[in-house]
Amino acid sequence: MRCVVYSIAKSSPLELVKIYQKQCRQFDCELELVDLFPKNTANAQKVSKKLAQKSYSLAFEPYLNPKAKNIALHPKAQRGDSFAFSKMLENHLNINFFIAGAYGFEENFLKDCQAWSLSEMTFSHEVAKIVLCEQIYRALSIIFKHPYHK
């Protein structure tokens, strides 16, 4: 299995994320983080919400894979517990997660993905990545009946 988290961000992986990446390997899952922040995104965010959203879509579109499960993290989307999250991931070999910038996704981009919400709360990119990586590891623990999730 391969899970890739694409985000509009400048930061590199945090230490805790590296721990979850290592733990996912025991389930034969390579957990990758790809931070994208093209030059046009910085300028677009200064101009308008619509232009910023368009720049996010342009950055992410090359990574949309019709053979993969594409999941966009969106605050108004479906949410569920860790078991529901694990069911959504189960039986997929390639999963792409997308975390937009401050202005969220364009509606057209969301049509190409399954939208999922981690919480009703707003998180910084760093916290969202940590929560997502932990939930991916927890989902794998549920799928493989590992004692991490009790």
Swiss-Prot record:
Pfam families in UniProt: SPOUT_MTase (PF02590)
Annotated GO MF terms: rRNA (pseudouridine-N3-)-methyltransferase activity
Top-level taxon: Bacteria
Principal location: cytoplasm
Record keywords, A-Z: Cytoplasm, Methyltransferase, rRNA processing, S-adenosyl-L-methionine, Transferase
Assigned GO CC terms: cytoplasm
Gene3D superfamilies for the chain: 3.40.1280.10
Broad EC category: transferase
Protein name (Swiss-Prot/TrEMBL): Ribosomal RNA large subunit methyltransferase H
Organism of origin: Helicobacter pylori (strain ATCC 700392 / 26695)
UniProt lineage: Bacteria, Pseudomonadati, Campylobacterota, Epsilonproteobacteria, Campylobacterales
